[in-house]
């Protein structure tokens, strides 16, 4: 059963990543529209602002994914420690 769970988590993670990628792309299009109206598209500052905005968006995405994975790891650790305590208590009660 754990194989199916791993596959579902993997597919779910890929779906969330694609959704986040689409959100970043949408933000980039809005930002590019704003920059093209205010700055010249071939100016140095346009390129700098665009690069910084892209880095910030990907940084936020990376931090969000890291936070989600850490929360999942903590939940799995808590579940494992609870099951170990239950196993120890059942062994002690059987002795």
UniProtKB/Swiss-Prot annotation:
UniProt region (Disordered), positions on chain: 76-95
Membrane disposition: Single-pass membrane protein
InterPro entries documented for this protein: Poxvirus_A9 (IPR006920)
Induction: Expressed in the late phase of the viral replicative cycle.
Organism domain of life: Viruses
Alphabetic keyword roster: Glycoprotein, Host cytoplasm, Late protein, Membrane, Signal, Transmembrane, Transmembrane helix, Viral envelope protein, Virion
Glycosylation site residues: 79, 87
Intravirion side: 23-45
Signal peptide residues on this chain, from the entry's feature table: 1-22
Composition-biased stretches (Low complexity): 77-95
GO cellular component labels: host cell cytoplasm; membrane; viral envelope; virion membrane
Positions on the Virion surface side per record topology: 67-83
Major place of residence: virion
Subcellular location: Virion membrane; Host cytoplasm
Transmembrane segments: 46-66
Keyword Cytoplasm attributed: no
Record's function text: Envelope protein. Required for an early step in virion morphogenesis.
Family in the record: Belongs to the oerthopoxvirus OPG135 family.
Protein name (record): Virion membrane protein OPG135
């Amino acid at each position: 059963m754990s194989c199916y769970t791993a596959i579902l988590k993997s597919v779910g993670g890929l779906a969330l990543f694609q959704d986040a990628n689409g959100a970043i792309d949408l933000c980039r299009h809005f930002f590019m529209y704003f920059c093209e109206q205010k700055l010249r598209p071939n100016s140095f500052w346009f390129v700098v602002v665009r690069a910084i905005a892209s880095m910030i968006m990907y940084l936020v995405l990376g931090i969000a994914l890291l936070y989600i994975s850490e929360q999942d790891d903590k939940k799995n650790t808590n579940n494992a420690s609870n099951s170990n305590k239950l196993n120890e208590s059942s062994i002690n009660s059987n002795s």
